Each structure stands twice: as C-alpha cells, then as structure tokens.
C-alpha cells in the first residue's frame, strides 16, 4: 500500500498546481501526471476538478465526505500517535526537561499508524474535488505525519507546497506579491488574512503550515532558515491570534535549542497564557522556572516553580516544584 501513495504525492501536487490557475504553470508547458499502476485505469475525482463549476449542493457533499471520512479520521490517528508517545515519556526533574513531553524518536516508530495517516490524507485529496474546504487540512496532516516520522525533506515539500498553492491571489488567479506593498498587500506581511465571524468556517491552513515549517527547520537545527520566517511572523499584523500561542512556542523552542535561556523562558511564559490549566501546563511552568534559573533570574524562577504546584496532577512534579522553589529562594 505504501508504494501506491508515495508516488501519488508528486501527482497530486502537480495536479493541484495545474488546476489552480495561470500563475501555476508556464504557457505551453504540459504537466504529466504519472499514476501508480492501481490508478492507471481510473479517473480520480481530483482530476475532474476543472470540469465545470462546483455548485453549492456538490460542495456540501464534497465537504461533508472529505471532512468526516478523511480529515477527521486522519486527525484522530495523528493525535493517537502523539498521545501514545506522551504516555511513554518520562521526565527527570533533576535535569533540564526536554522542550516537549514526547520525542520524535518515539513517534517515528509508530510508522504503521503514520503511514495510515498519509494514506487517509492522500486518498482524501485524490478522491475528491480539490475545491472542497478540507484539502489544505489534508495536505497539512500529510506533512505533519512525515515530520513525526522524521522524514523532514518530505515534510518540507508538503509545507512549502501549502505555502505556495494557498498564497494570496488576484481575482484572475495570479499571485499577489507577498512581503511587498504592491497589489494592496502590507509590505511587512507574509501571512494569510483569515476570515472572521460566525460563518467564517474552517480557517485556511497556510498559516499553520508556516508554523510547522519552522518546527521542521528547528528539528534539523536549521536555525538560520527558521529565524528568517520567525522574524517575519513576529512583526506580521496579519498573522492570526489563534496561532499566537504556537508562534510563541516555536520562538521559545528556537532559543531553547540555542541555549539562550532567558529569551527561551520569556517566550515560553508568553505561550503559557494560551494553555489550559492542565498537567502539561504545570510541566511547562516548571520548565520555565528551570530556564529562568539557568539565566540567573531566581525571582522569576521561583514564580514559575510556584505556579506549577497547584496546576500539577502529578505528585512527583508537585514535590519537585516545591523543592525547586525553596532552592532558588535560598539562593536569592
């Protein structure tokens, strides 16, 4: 089964670029769409995307089937992989905690489940009209699955594709100039403006893909590439509020990996404001305390160690937080 869907990535991406409009292909350039043998005699629904308009009844059907049969199931499988990785994770509170409470070295071992996510995502794209509202979600899930398998080059391909294919466009299909004041854009903006309101629907996933691209860079310690994108998003007024917690997370992660403890703690503390009061939040508060302690700021370290105590449902974490708070208080 895996041999079927790995080659399909190129076909689906090339097909999407061809269908999107005149900015996607050069004049006179014919795009070939090689299919795996199992699909050679079949015209996929995605290949019929350009055949006529997708009217409201058809779009409702495409959205419903793609969402509940494919996007929902792929998301559930992906969450299960992460949950299992978290369940086997064990922290040593006597040392600096890892940034995440799971490891990619663990998630990559769950390759069968992640391959199933990739299969669900690629099938959901191939078997449905590309103009439905969930195609970008499926491309994103596909990329995340590759990231969790530590197939960073393949993940990069998907995230970059989302960034390109779903970039802002003019009515005639041509790209707006991103990061420039031309075409009515803001010169400092690279993010996609998201619709707001009750009827806005599922937000476009291009902005999410930018965050995952940063995570992908940082997993490979490609700090220069991550820094350029981070700096652009930090000052981008268009970047949505719903992803500010994620942005603060990857900024903190970047500083953490470079052992810039004070800055890592500052942005981790900002990230905490968007997290529910759970044991995971308590763990991150403890980590923030550790980072401030490493930076020599014992007052801030005590504050976050103390915050972790009432939020923790883990007795060991609660005890270690109390001990750490007493330790830095005495050091002060």
Name these PLM-found stretches:
Residues 2-12:
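Bacterial N-terminal signal peptides that target proteins for export
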């Amino acid at each position: 089964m895996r041999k079927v869907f790995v080659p399909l990535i190129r076909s689906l991406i090339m097909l999407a670029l061809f269908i999107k409009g005149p900015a996607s292909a050069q004049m006179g350039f014919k795009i070939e769409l090689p299919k795996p043998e199992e699909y050679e005699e079949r015209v996929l629904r995605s290949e019929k995307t350009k055949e006529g308009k997708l009217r409201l009844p058809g779009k409702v059907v495409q959205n419903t089937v793609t969402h509940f049969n494919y996007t929902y199931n792929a998301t559930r499988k992906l969450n299960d992989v992460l949950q299992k990785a978290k369940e086997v994770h064990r922290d040593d509170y006597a040392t600096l905690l890892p940034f995440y409470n799971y490891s990619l070295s663990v998630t990559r071992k769950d390759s069968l489940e992640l391959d199933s996510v990739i299969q669900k995502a690629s099938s959901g794209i191939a078997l449905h009209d590309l103009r439905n509202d969930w195609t970008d979600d499926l491309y994103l899930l596909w990329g995340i699955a590759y990231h969790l398998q530590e197939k960073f080059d393949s993940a990069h391909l998907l995230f970059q594709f989302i960034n390109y294919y779903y970039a802002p466009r003019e009515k005639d299909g041509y790209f707006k100039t991103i990061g420039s004041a031309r075409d009515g854009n803001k010169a400092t903006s690279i993010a996609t403006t998201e619709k707001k309101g009750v009827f806005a629907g599922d937000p476009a996933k291009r902005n999410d893909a930018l965050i995952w691209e940063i995570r992908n860079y940082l997993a490979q310690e490609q700090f220069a590439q991550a820094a350029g994108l981070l700096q652009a998003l930090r000052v981008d007024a268009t970047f949505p509020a719903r992803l500010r917690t994620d942005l603060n997370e990857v900024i903190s992660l970047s500083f953490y990996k470079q052992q810039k403890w004070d800055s890592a703690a500052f942005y981790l503390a900002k990230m905490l404001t968007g997290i529910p009061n759970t044991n995971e939040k308590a763990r991150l508060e403890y980590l923030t305390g550790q980072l401030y302690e490493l930076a020599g700021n014992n007052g801030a370290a005590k504050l976050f160690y103390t915050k972790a105590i009432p939020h923790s449902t883990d007795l060991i974490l609660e005890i270690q937080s109390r001990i750490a708070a007493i330790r830095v208080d005495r050091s002060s």
